[in-house]
């Protein structure tokens, strides 16, 4: 069994994205940055990451492209997929909520989760259902004639690897 996983990456901009995804695929392993003076034992694993070309992409698109690339690579290395795909550090229902507000239909939102974020169909449906419930609650609040305080406490029945 591996003792440690070291991430060797050619662009530190994506280090945080990389460490979170690697930890998601290897939840019981310690993950650290590979440095020039790192001593690697035969039980350790080094994941060498070359960041793909990001020409013409904005910051958000670059991070999505990198996470998609690394997710595919880690999935291939481990033979595993993650229920929420590469989504980490974000409430999936927020993505669905914004898309519903923008008038997108449920099928389009589900395809977005599955194709872009690599989430399972089951989790995509869950995000949509939670977003619809949030929307129903928030639509009942009278913003004009009083004060409202909304505390975003997740009521999602699943526990994400990063939650």
Describe every region a protein language model picked out:
Residues 90-97, 133-163:
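N-terminal pre-triad scaffold of radical SAM enzymes
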Residues 27, 42-45, 58, 83, ...:
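Extended interaction regions within the primary functional domain
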Residues 1-83:
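A short, structured N-terminal alpha-helical element that caps or precedes a catalytic domain
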Residues 74-81, 101-149:
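N-terminal [4Fe-4S]-dependent radical SAM core
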Residues 1-5, 37-44, 87-102, 115:
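SAM-dependent transferase fold signal centered on methyltransferase-like domains
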